[in-house]
Amino acid sequence: MSERQAEACAAAGADAIGMISFPRSPRHIDHRRMRLITSNLPANVCPVGVFVNENFEKIMATVETGRLRAVQLHGQESPDLVEALSAEGLIVIKALFVDGRPALDQAARYPASGFLVECAGGPLPGGNALQWTWSDARRISSDRPVVLAGGLSPENVGEAIEAGIPDAVDVSSGVETAPGQKDIDKVTAFCRAVAANDQITPRRIFR
């Protein structure tokens, strides 16, 4: 994702911009480019770094260089790491899955700001366009902030919101022409579809 694409996503109505710090991913963005992206975002858009099994020091170095306000942890990170990052004033979102299946029963272990729930059945963390039963998210969304992901697109995000009642939704491949290349028309359509269902989302994470 380029600086221009990030700015266009923000203008389309995105509440947050996710940037993946994971070299194996085709969407990987190094911390220097993160800073270029975050420097041009409006104050009401939250820059989020996505990490996979990274240690506290590496995450914080990227947070500081990239000027991130939130982190999304997509691996087997410990509750202690979540607590340490939260103590730094960060919004911490923990992805919940075990062996490619949503692991909603693990939420109570983590002092996180919110939880990303998806099927996680692909070869890389996130962005695999795999759908699952979105209504399963209701098992925790009633009392814990939830970010819903997994096979979302402009055509189905309204249905997903109605099914899972999340605080936010996370999309990647559903609005891309290629990994990391956003289709701004699709982003705009996606944001409009989310806004049309805004009245049923608790919004406990980014607003």
Residue spans of the language-model regions?
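Conserved N-terminal beta1-alpha1 strand-loop-helix module at the mouth
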Residues: M1-R207
